[in-house]
Design a protein with these regions (language model features):
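Short solvent-exposed beta->alpha transition segments
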Residues: 9-10, 25-71
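N-terminal cap/lid segment of alpha/beta-hydrolase-fold proteins
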Residues: 109-148
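Short, surface-exposed "cap/lid" segments of acyl-processing enzymes
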Residues: 146-180
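Alpha/beta-hydrolase active-site loop
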Residues: 205-227
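Accessory cap/linker subdomain of secreted extracellular hydrolases
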Residues: 258-340
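Short beta-strand/loop motif that positions the catalytic acidic residue
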Residues: 341, 347-349
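Conserved alpha/beta-hydrolase "acid-adjacent" motif
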Residues: 354-360
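Catalytic active-site module of serine/aspartate enzymes centered on a nucleophile-bearing elbow/loop
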Residues: 383-387, 391-420
Length: 420
C-alpha cells in the first residue's frame, strides 16, 4: 500500500529521530535501493560529521516540513540547529515509504548571484544533450557574442552527484567559471553528471571512467561541430575529481588541446578520505569522531589490499562506492597519465584547501611535471577548495557562506588559454 503525504511526514520524523541519535546503520535501511547503493552508513556518518564539525556541533534535529504541492515523492526539509548556525537535511519520501534522495544543505536559503566579473550581455547560452541512451546528460553551451572562432573549455565537476554548476548551498563555482570565462571570449560547455541526473539508472559496476569519459568526450565532439569554436583549441577544465579524470579523458582523445586542473587530487582517494576525516574529527573531537575515523581507515585498508574483489560489498568500502569503482580508481594513476601526454597544462591549487592539499596532492604533480616548459603550476595562497578567498583555519562551514571563484583565477585561466 502506498502512503500519502501525511505518511511521508511520519517516515521523515522517524528518519529525523535516527539522525538525532546518529544511528546511521538503521538510517540506510530506510533508503530505496538506488540510494542505498550510492550512500553507505559510513559515507553518511562522514558527511554528518563534516557538517557538524563545520557548524560547531549539532544541538537539535528539528521537526520535518514538506514542500508544498508535491505528492510522490514528497520533498521534505529537516532543519538541524548547531552551535554556529546550522544546516538542512533535504530528502524525498516516495509512496513506497522509502527515502529516494538525500543531501545536506546550508541554512539561510541564500541565492546565487553572478560574480562582478561576469557580463551577461557578452554571451548567449543554450541547452544541449550529451550522449545517447539512459545515461545521456543535459548541459549548457555558453558562447561569446561575435563570430569567433573562440577557444573552448569543457568543465568537469568534482566527485559526487553534482549538477552542471557544481551547486553546493548558495554557491555555484562552475557557473562562476563558465560565466567569467565566456565573458572573456572563451566558449564553455558544462553538464550535469550522471550521478546527479540519473542516480536510479547507474549500473552496479559503474566506475569513474563511466562517470566522466562518455559525457566529456561527447562534449568535445559537440564543441568541435560549432562554427564559433576553434576546433584545435578545445581544452578540459577539471575541478577536484574532475581534474583527476582530465588526463584520462585527454588520453582517450588526442585532439584535446590542453588541460586546466583546479585542485586536482593525486593522492589515492582512499588515503585522502582518511586524511580528510582526521581533519574533520579534529574540529569536533570525541568518541564518535574517533570511531568514524577508525571505521573509515579499516575500509580504506581493504581498498588497498589484495582482498578487494569485484564482489566486495560496498558497505565494507569507503564513501559507499562499489568495489568496481574502487578497483578502477586503484588502477588509474592521474599523474603518470598526465606525464604521458604532450599537451600543455595549467595546474592551480588553493593554499587553504584541506581536501586537496599542497603537500599531499600538488607535490605529486610538481614532482612529475614542473620541469616541463609547457606546464604551469601556481598556488593561490588564500583560496580554499572552491577557489574562494578566505583566511584562517579552513573548515566545511566556509562552503555554506555565499562566495565566488577568485577573479585572479578566472583571469589566469583566460590569459593562459589566450597563449595557446
Amino acid at each position: 500500500m502506498r502512503i500519502d503525504k501525511g505518511g511521508a511526514l511520519e517516515v521523515a520524523r522517524g528518519f529525523a529521530a535516527l539522525l538525532q541519535a546518529e544511528r546511521f546503520d538503521e538510517i540506510v535501511e530506510l533508503f530505496a535501493p538506488p540510494l542505498r547503493a550510492a550512500v553507505s552508513a559510513e559515507a553518511l556518518r562522514l558527511a554528518w560529521a563534516a557538517q557538524a564539525a563545520g557548524h560547531g556541533g549539532v544541538r537539535a534535529v528539528e521537526e520535518p516540513a514538506s514542500q508544498a504541492g508535491e505528492a510522490d515523492p514528497v520533498r521534505v526539509h529537516i532543519p538541524v540547529t548547531c552551535a554556529n548556525s546550522g544546516f538542512t537535511v533535504v530528502t524525498s519520501v516516495g509512496g513506497d515509504g522509502l527515502l529516494h534522495g538525500l543531501r545536506l544543505d546550508p541554512h539561510g536559503g541564500a541565492e546565487w548571484h553572478p560574480p562582478h566579473y561576469a557580463d551577461t550581455a557578452r554571451f548567449t547560452e543554450r541547452d544541449v544533450m550529451l550522449g545517447t541512451g539512459p545515461l545521456a546528460v543535459p548541459g549548457t553551451l555558453s558562447l561569446p557574442v561575435g563570430p569567433g572562432p573562440w577557444p573552448a573549455v569543457v568543465l568537469l565537476s568534482g566527485g559526487g552527484a553534482f549538477d552542471r554548476d557544481e551547486s553546493s548551498g548558495p554557491n555555484k563555482p562552475l557557473k562562476d567559471l563558465a560565466w567569467g570565462l565566456v565573458t572573456r571570449q572563451v566558449a564553455v560547455l558544462r553538464f550535469d553528471k550522471a550521478t546527479f541526473a540519473h542516480p536510479d539508472r547507474l549500473p552496479q559496476d559503474f566506475t569513474m571512467a563511466d562517470e566522466y569519459l562518455p559525457p566529456a568526450l561527447a562534449a568535445v565532439r559537440l564543441l568541435r561541430q560549432q562554427p564559433e569554436v576553434a576546433p584545435d583549441r578545445i581544452h578540459l577544465l577539471g575541478h577536484s575529481m574532475g581534474g583527476k579524470a582530465a588526463p584520462r579523458i585527454a588520453a582517450a582523445d588526442p585532439s584535446i588541446a590542453g588541460l586546466v586542473l583546479l585542485a586536482a587530487d593525486a593522492q589515492p582517494m582512499h588515503e585522502a578520505a582518511v586524511r580528510v576525516a582526521r581533519h574533520l574529527a579534529a574540529l569536533a573531537p570525541g568518541p564518535g569522531a574517533e570511531e568514524m575515523v577508525a571505521a573509515l581507515a579499516r575500509q580504506a585498508a581493504l581498498v588497498a589490499s589484495p582482498g578487494l574483489t569485484p564482489d566486495t560489498p560496498s558497505k565494507l568500502l569507503p564513501l559507499g562506492f562499489s568495489a568496481s569503482y574502487w578497483l578502477d580508481l586503484r588502477a588509474y594513476d592521474p599523474v603518470a597519465t598526465a606525464a604521458g601526454l604532450a599537451c600543455p597544462m595549467l595546474i592551480l591549487q588553493g593554499g587553504r584547501d584541506y581536501q586537496v592539499t599542497v603537500a599531499d596532492d600538488l607535490a605529486r604533480w610538481q614532482n612529475a611535471l614542473a620541469h616541463r616548459p609547457e606546464v604551469t603550476i601556481r598556488i593561490h595562497q588564500d583560496a580554499n577548495h572552491l577557489f574562494f578567498p578566505g583566511s584562517g583555519h579552513p573548515t566545511p562551514a566556509e562552503y555554506a557562506r555565499p562566495g565566488h571563484v577568485e577573479p585572479a583565477v578566472v583571469d589566469e585561466i583566460t590569459a593562459w588559454l589566450a597563449r595557446r
